[in-house]
Each structure stands twice: as C-alpha cells, then as structure tokens.
C-alpha cells in the first residue's frame, strides 16, 4: 500500500474476502507494507552509503525531455544516468533529489526461472531505477525486495509482466549480500483480443463470478489448467 492514491481499505478487505471464497486461508499475520517504510528507507541509505545508489537531481523537465527524445526515436525510455558519477558538491540547491539504484552496466544477468528456465538480460538495458522518491517515500521495487528478505521468502511466484522488476530486485539482493529467493514467472491471462486482462478494462472480479453462481472449486480448476495439464486429470482439490 505504498501508493497512497490507489491504496484503499476496501481493496484490502475485498482481497481477503476473495481469497477466502476460493478456499485459500492465509496462515500468517496481516502485513501492511506502509508500516515498514522506515526499514525501506534504511536500506536505501545503506545502498547510498556503500556506493550502490546515488542522488539524482534531474528536474521533471529534464526527465520529460529525455522521454520525448526516446519516443521520437521509437526507443524505450531509459534514464541517461547523468548524475551517476557527478559529485554531490555540484548539486543544484533548488531541487530535491530522488535516490536511484546504481545498476550494473557491463555484462549480463541470468535469472534461473522455475518455469521459464534460464532467462538472460543485457545489464545495459536495466535503468538506474528510483528507489526513493524526492518526497522520501520508497518505490515498489525497493519495498518489495526488503519485505521479501525480512519475511524470509523462499519462492516468489508472479506474472510474466514482473520479470523486468525481478532483474532489478535481484541487483538489490546482490548489493546487500542477501540470499536470492527462487523466482517463477507464469503466463498472464489475456482477453479475446490478446490484451493482458486488466481491472482497468473492466475485467470481472471474483465477487462477480460468485454472484452469478460460479463455484469456487470450478474456478480454481479452470485457472489451474490454463496453459498447464497433468496427465488426463481434470479435477484438483486444495
């Protein structure tokens, strides 16, 4: 819930309600990410201190101009790393900096994915991503990494669209000398048009399916067998 504009209590209540309807009971304590912000900021400062992060003083106008040039060249936007090696003594006094992680530039990183096998990426394509905004609040990739480490997560399973985030988070793990968890990225559910199914496109919720009489056992089996099968077995139980 680090995104204050989109995080609301009713969303949390609905998630827990939907999981219970599916028959998935969480056996741990309820965890609220925003209560751990001080831990996230502490790690950002450690990364800054050990040379794995830096303060970026680019103005909003500079960033927008970089994005505009990338669009004109039909290239994905990657921050140009302007402040990566500039001494802080040269910093402007009227701009509050963000803190960026100093991503590796040379070589490549290999993700040993439990579903997709070895996935390799050129490190130069991973931007120096923001870990602390200029208002001092942490971003998703920092918060999620710190939380997963502190909660001793051994396996992280999520959608294929998070793969680029995994490469970023792996760099934080390595910079902090933390043990890497095992990662698995699963295919996304798409619409008839081939687009990613999204709540922004008015995709149905579990509550919608419940109201029209879909049984949780049926929906679980349907989701499980999307893109996967086990011999001729069609019915699975928790």
Residue ranges: model-predicted function:
Residues 201, 205-238:
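A conserved active-site cap/scaffold subdomain adjacent to cofactor or substrate pockets
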Residues 1-27, 40-49, 59-62, 70, ...:
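N-terminal, positively charged nucleic-acid-binding surface of large information/translation enzymes
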Residues 6, 10-14, 174, 189, ...:
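Glycine/small-residue-rich interface belts in oligomeric ring/scaffold proteins
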Residues 27-35:
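A short, structured active-site edge motif that brings together acidic residues
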Residues 18, 50, 172-175, 212, ...:
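Generic, well-ordered alpha-helical scaffold segments in large soluble proteins
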Residues 3-8, 35-37, 162, 190:
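Acidic, metal-coordinating catalytic cores used for nucleic-acid/nucleotide bond scission
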Residues 22-24, 149-152, 196-202, 218-224:
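Short acidic (Asp/Glu) and glycine-rich catalytic loops that position anionic groups and cofactors
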Residues 33, 49-185, 190-197, 205, ...:
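Active-site cores that bind ATP or allylic diphosphates and position pyrophosphate for catalysis
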């Amino acid at each position: 819930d680090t995104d204050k504009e989109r995080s609301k209590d009713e969303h949390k209540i609905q998630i827990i309600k939907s999981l219970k309807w599916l028959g998935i009971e969480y056996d741990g304590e309820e965890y609220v990410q925003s209560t751990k912000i001080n831990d996230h900021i502490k790690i950002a400062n450690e990364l800054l201190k050990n040379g794995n992060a830096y303060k970026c003083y680019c103005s909003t106008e500079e960033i927008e101009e970089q994005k505009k040039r990338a669009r004109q060249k039909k290239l994905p936007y990657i921050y140009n790393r302007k402040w990566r090696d500039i001494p802080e003594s040269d910093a402007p006094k009227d701009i509050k900096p963000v803190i960026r992680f100093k991503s590796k530039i040379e070589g490549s990183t290999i993700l040993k994915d439990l579903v997709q096998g070895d996935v390799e990426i050129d490190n130069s394509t991973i931007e120096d991503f923001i870990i602390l905004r200029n208002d001092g609040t942490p971003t998703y990739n920092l918060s999620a990494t710190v939380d997963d480490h502190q909660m001793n997560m051994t396996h992280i399973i999520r959608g294929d669209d998070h793969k680029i985030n995994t490469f970023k988070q792996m760099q934080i793990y390595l910079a902090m000398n933390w043990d890497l968890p095992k990662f698995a990225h699963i295919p996304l559910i798409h619409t008839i048009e081939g687009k990613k199914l999204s709540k922004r496109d008015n995709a149905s919720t579990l509550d919608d399916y419940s109201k029209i009489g879909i049984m949780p056992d049926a929906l679980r089996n349907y989701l499980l067998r999307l893109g996967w099968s086990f011999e001729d077995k069609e019915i699975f139980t928790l």
